[in-house]
A protein has these predicted regions:
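Primary mode marks residue(s) on the alpha4-beta5-alpha5 output face of response regulator receiver
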Residues: 30-245
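Bacterial Sec-dependent signal peptides at the C-terminal "C-region" and cleavage site
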Residues: 21-33
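Bacterial N-terminal signal peptides that target proteins for export
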Residues: 2-10
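Bacterial N-terminal signal peptides
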Residues: 11-20
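Intrinsically disordered, low-complexity segments enriched in polar/charged small residues
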Residues: 9-12, 241
Length: 245
């Protein structure tokens, strides 16, 4: 691996870590204030399309395959043994991504519901993990038509994390707090404002991603994108598809 590639990976890991820390420290419930309100400028969601013939059946088949993919990994030790890695295991998170980077790389070229990029777990009081769902990804340049071919956009809403302003040296603290300025919880959402603040603007931090929770019985929760369903949507481990400019 070249020094440049290593620096890129370390920088992207830093960005992802900031996402997690900000999500864990942001206020929950009530109105959207401070960082949570600013998050609206950093998330792009595909629009729901009208339901087409065959969409429901296709989505149901993906959910069934996701269940099959998850079955061996109810014991998280098996996931670790099979090459899944916990992203930022020592940082408290509502949900932990166990990511298989080989699967993620393959997902930029094909869609196989039996090989998700990430397994989604909640941490138990005893230190173990309970399997909740999976995450599928695609490259950042994929069109919405391509996403629709993978999972119908009448059923699922794919999302990207966008408009990241990297803080200039010495301004680390402004990623956090009740009114953050930089990062994916920050008030800065445009290149112009970022450059005026001395930052570096990154239009797309991660590739396309979508969560599936096959064990849910309510269809709305199977394809949940928010915390109202008890799931966390702060994705941070979809390394494939990252775009730096």
């Amino acid at each position: 691996m070249s020094p440049r590639s290593l620096r890129s990976i370390l920088f992207l890991s830093l960005i992802a870590g900031l996402v997690v820390i900000a999500a864990a420290s942001a206020p929950r419930g009530g109105g959207q204030t401070g960082g949570m309100a600013h998050m609206m400028g950093h998330m792009y969601l595909t629009a729901l399309r009208p339901l087409q013939p065959g969409d429901r059946e296709k989505a149901d088949a993906i959910v069934a395959d996701a269940k099959i993919a998850m079955e061996p990994y109810k014991d998280y030790h098996r996931a670790l043994a099979d090459g899944y890695r916990i992203f930022l295991p020592n940082i408290p998170q509502p949900q932990y991504h166990f990511t298989n980077y080989a699967n993620g790389r393959e997902e930029t070229q094909r869609f196989d519901p039996l090989k998700p990029t990430s397994l989604l777990y909640k941490k138990n009081a005893d230190g173990g993990y309970t399997l909740m769902g999976v995450m599928y990804t695609d490259r950042v340049t994929a069109s919405e038509e391509e996403l629709n071919e993978r999972i119908p956009l009448s059923i699922a809403r794919w999302h990207q994390h966008v408009n990241f302003c990297k803080a200039p040296f010495g301004h680390w603290s402004e990623y956090f707090g009740p009114n953050p300025k930089f990062g994916l919880m920050g008030s800065i959402t445009t290149r112009e404002d970022c450059e005026a603040a001395g930052g570096v603007f990154i239009p797309h931090v991660l590739g396309w991603m979508v969560h599936v929770y096959p064990y849910e019985t309510d269809p709305a929760k199977v394809w949940s994108i928010d915390d109202d369903a008890g799931h966390d949507n702060m994705d941070h481990s979809a390394m494939p598809g990252m775009k730096m400019n």
